[in-house]
Amino acid sequence: MAGFYGRDIISVRDLDRQALEEVFRYTEKFVKMTPSERRSVAGGRTLGYLFYEPSTRTRLSFQAAMASAGGTSLGIADVSSSSIQKGESLADTVRMMAMYSDALVLRHPLDGSSRFAAEVSDKPVINAGSGTEEHPTQAIQDLFTIRREKGGIDGLNIGVVGDLKYGRTVYSLLHALGNYDVKVSLISPEPLRIRTDSIYDIRTKLDFAESESLDEYVDELDVVYVTRIQKERFPDEEEYLKVKGSYVIGLDMLRKMKDGAIILHPLPRLDEISGEVDGTDKAKYFVQAEYGVYTRAALLGLVLNEGGF
């Protein structure tokens, strides 16, 4: 990928290691900037957002990132109060929002929605979650957190735990990790194993093993990336109830983990990480959420400014 200026950010598969490291460098630069320096990154620009699915952290972090970078944001966070409720097409909504903004952020329940939006928009489109496919800015945030908290990514042993079938953050994370020298353990209940097509896609890039047992690997892991089992993706609630609560990270599990190991979660969480873990030095999921503002600000700065900032 040659440069970010004016580019759509649809999939981490479009980002090689060099591109990811560029985002990380600019994120570190943004973190070190004074408030007045930050406001020059996107000053005078407007970010449009379209969220067809509920979102707290992703939407608010994009808004916070744009505000911190000196820009403004506007958009649709509740489709029930917009013309979408009247039957307006995705294409028309995207075209309309593109007229009001310099870049667009889209979350949509349908696979392929972000690529479609990029085809009809004359402004850069950033994928904030498309169906069960990908969530690229979450993966960037996740890798930055690992890099910052562990001092690097290469050589780490990373466990990805929970819903590997429906979790779009998982697919983006695994593809991004394929650019680094890491070992990955994919830990899930049998019904929530990573999809066969995705296994095929990452097999040549990633050293990984699959298991249903977290206990089997937890003492070897440098990073435990926990995901929520997503009730809303299940066609049958009974099937959800069979796997709900399959893994719970509590203090007993922490005692089995390596010194210096960290726990991440894309959030929101349900009961997969006990609240008693929050105050420990291994709990990095709230810091991870904070880093999302910085990584998104850096990404917006790269997309909106020729030659970076």
Curated annotation (Swiss-Prot):
One of its GO terms (biological process) is 'de novo' pyrimidine nucleobase biosynthetic process. It comes from Cenarchaeum symbiosum (strain A). Catalyzes the condensation of carbamoyl phosphate and aspartate to form carbamoyl aspartate and inorganic phosphate, the committed step in the de novo pyrimidine nucleotide biosynthesis pathway. GO terms for molecular function: amino acid binding; aspartate carbamoyltransferase activity. InterPro entries: Asp/Orn_carbamoyltranf_P-bd, Asp/Orn_carbamoylTrfase, Asp/Orn_carbamoylTrfase_sf, Asp_carbamoyltransf, Asp_carbamoyltransf_Asp/Orn-bd. Belongs to the aspartate/ornithine carbamoyltransferase superfamily. ATCase family. The keyword Transferase applies. The lineage of its organism: Archaea, Nitrososphaerota, Candidatus Cenarchaeales, Candidatus Cenarchaeaceae, Candidatus Cenarchaeum. Pathway: Pyrimidine metabolism; UMP biosynthesis via de novo pathway; (S)-dihydroorotate from bicarbonate: step 2/3. Carbamoyl phosphate binds at R57, T58, R107, H135, Q138, L267, P268. The keyword Membrane does not apply. This is Aspartate carbamoyltransferase catalytic subunit. It catalyses: carbamoyl phosphate + L-aspartate = N-carbamoyl-L-aspartate + phosphate + H(+).
